[in-house]
Amino acid sequence: MEIDILSLFPDYFTSPLQATILGRAIKQGALSIRSRDIREFGLGKWKQVDDAPYSGEGMLLMAEPVVQAIRSVKREKSKVVYLSPQGQLLSAKKSRELSLCPHLILLCGHYEGIDERALASEVDEEISIGDYVLTNGCAAALVLVDALARFIPGVLGNQESAECDSLENGLLEGPHYTRPRVFEGVQVPEILFCGDHQRIANWRKKVSLERTRERRPDLYLQYFYGDRAFWGAQEDPLKMRETSPQAFSVVLEVKDLRKAKKFYSRMFGKEHWDGDKLLLGEKTSLYLQQTNERRGATKVFVELETEDGFVRFLRRWEMLGGQLGEVGMGNLPLRQVFDLDGHIWVVSCVQK
């Protein structure tokens, strides 16, 4: 893979690209990284690259030097990425995607930014490394290079480690331990010595979920309700049992129609609304009516096909902001839950 970095401070990259894993990868030929100075394409005797904006404070990089710098290294299959706080947030998924590009051109921002005409003409994508502002885009470019390099064959000594790291499956990693077995009275969990690889994997997954929920609730929500068709690749939408042979509709009065639609879309994994109607099953529909004066709470009965579906229903309901109420008496899995408008859903599952 080839990467060209365009900035006003090409020497900024010298040490990081000579040391550590990146330096070794470059020496071995797995990576080729060049740093170019945009000032080489500056205008006039003094190689001017910046000027005052027509409206606003500070200075801007001028369009002509930036465009010329990009075009000097651009090829047919090049992808130009501008490091900007306005861009898409960098993720493990995006890093993996970029690692497949044969040639990347990374454009570093400076001053107050870059003339919009240069961006519109040459940039394919804008990427941000976080919701904060740096003195320039060089540090962001290094972060991006380091993140994507891990997915290039030959960069890491053990490529499997890249597949198992935090965020690769959308979750944080669990804890790691090495010798000694006991340190200052704290022991390594016994399960790691059991020899049962499946039990250990299940334990790691459980701890990973718990850690993500505690430390990064945003990632936890995205794992279950994010961009993997909402449910994740391994899960299907919740299946409700429809006992009535007739078409059945539930009508709920809500204060905030938009908020309620979002809640139920995520809850049932269904994005397509027919106006204010959402089809929950083959014969069951949910209608929402916005009103400022609700006449009272509606009680809805839902029976799920499996106990696993019952548990997932409650977990998702709570994570999306709904409230869990009383647990039913007896052996039947039964629970009352309340939606964002106080309507009561009585949830149970089929007994087999």
From Swiss-Prot:
InterPro entries named in the record: Alpha/beta_knot_MTases (IPR029028), Glyas_Bleomycin-R_OHBP_Dase (IPR029068), tRNA_m1G_MeTrfase_C_sf (IPR023148), tRNA_m1G_MeTrfase_TrmD (IPR002649), tRNA_m1G_MTases_N (IPR029026), tRNA_MeTrfase_TRMD/TRM10 (IPR016009)
This protein's UniProt keywords: Cytoplasm, Methyltransferase, S-adenosyl-L-methionine, Transferase, tRNA processing
Keyword field contains tRNA processing: yes
Top-level taxon: Bacteria
Molecular functions (GO terms): tRNA (guanine(37)-N1)-methyltransferase activity
Catalytic activity: guanosine(37) in tRNA + S-adenosyl-L-methionine = N(1)-methylguanosine(37) in tRNA + S-adenosyl-L-homocysteine + H(+)
Protein EC: 2.1.1.228
Subunit field text: Homodimer.
Function comment: Specifically methylates guanosine-37 in various tRNAs.
Record's protein name: tRNA (guanine-N(1)-)-methyltransferase
